[in-house]
């Protein structure tokens, strides 16, 4: 079965829509005719994006400016989505830290787990019954190539993405024959307009990066085909292969030394 066609009533939800892959997903969905619900903390950026999508593509773009790492803010959104006709859910919001986990802020590390893993679980479970009942829907989960292997100096992020990677591909197996597509996006470095990338960008060769727009189009095309996993970019493909076949005791110190440099 194909994904539900866009209608006046249904919506495509994008979390982390204020920047990067999230913004690109929202733009690509609007280009394909979907009205959206845009979710992120920065309401000013969401409002600018919503206005642009409406003006350029004639779609409705709703804004939900909330912190998905906060359970009290997340719960009303999950309740709302459970009652709405959600055609597509893009669980994209995520954040990372670099450095030895014992030296990082425990509260922020916990927030990473809430945002990268628990929020993905909560929002997916909110929309899933409706999608199954309608026998149609698509769930795109942004995991990471980092979730395929142990990564010292990126421990919390890698662990959170190991959850999303496994959850996405396990869920896809459960939904066979139910009309609901599930695709895992496992990207490596993605070039955006975010100035926070400047320092990281100097340590990663230009040829390794892919653009957010390319990633978004590739991901939504893969979701339409109900592809299990989409892996854009050379480094993410290499990390996927290494995570499956290389001895973990060998890859961990090699990858960890690189991530140590990212942590300064």
Annotate each PLM feature.
Residues 92-97:
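Conserved NAD(P)H cofactor-binding loop of Rossmann-fold oxidoreductase domains
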Residues 32-49:
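Conserved glycine-rich Rossmann-like NAD(P)H-binding loop of the short-chain dehydrogenase/reductase
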Residues 144:
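Residue(s) in the substrate-gating loop at a strand-loop-helix junction
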Residues 18-20:
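Conserved glycine-rich cofactor-binding loop
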Residues 100-101, 108-111:
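Substrate-binding pocket helix/loop in short-chain dehydrogenase/reductase
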């Amino acid at each position: 079965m194909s994904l539900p066609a866009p209608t006046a009533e249904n919506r495509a939800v994008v979390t982390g829509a204020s920047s990067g892959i999230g913004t690109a997903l929202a733009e690509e969905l609007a280009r394909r005719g979907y009205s959206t619900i845009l979710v992120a903390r920065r309401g000013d950026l969401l409002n600018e994006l919503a206005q642009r999508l409406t003006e350029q593509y004639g779609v409705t773009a709703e804004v939900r400016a909330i912190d998905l790492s906060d359970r009290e803010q997340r719960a009303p959104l999950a309740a709302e989505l459970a009652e709405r006709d959600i055609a597509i859910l893009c669980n994209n919001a995520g954040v990372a830290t670099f450095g030895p986990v014992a030296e990082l802020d425990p509260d922020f590390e916990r927030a990473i787990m809430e945002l990268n893993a628990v929020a993905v679980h909560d929002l997916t479970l909110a929309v899933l019954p409706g999608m199954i009942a309608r026998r149609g829907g698509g769930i795109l989960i942004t995991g990471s190539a980092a979730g395929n292997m142990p990564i010292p100096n990126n421990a919390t992020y890698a662990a959170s993405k190991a959850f999303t990677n496994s959850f996405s591909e396990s869920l896809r197996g459960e939904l066979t024959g139910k009309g609901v597509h599930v695709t895992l996006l496992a990207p490596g470095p993605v070039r955006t307009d975010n100035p926070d990338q400047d320092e990281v960008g100097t340590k990663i060769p230009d040829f390794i990066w892919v653009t957010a727009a390319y990633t978004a189009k590739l991901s939504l095309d893969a979701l339409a085909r109900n592809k299990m996993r989409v892996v854009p970019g050379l480094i993410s493909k290499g990390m996927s292969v290494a995570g499956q076949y290389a001895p973990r005791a060998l890859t961990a110190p090699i990858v960890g030394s690189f991530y140590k440099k990212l942590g300064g």
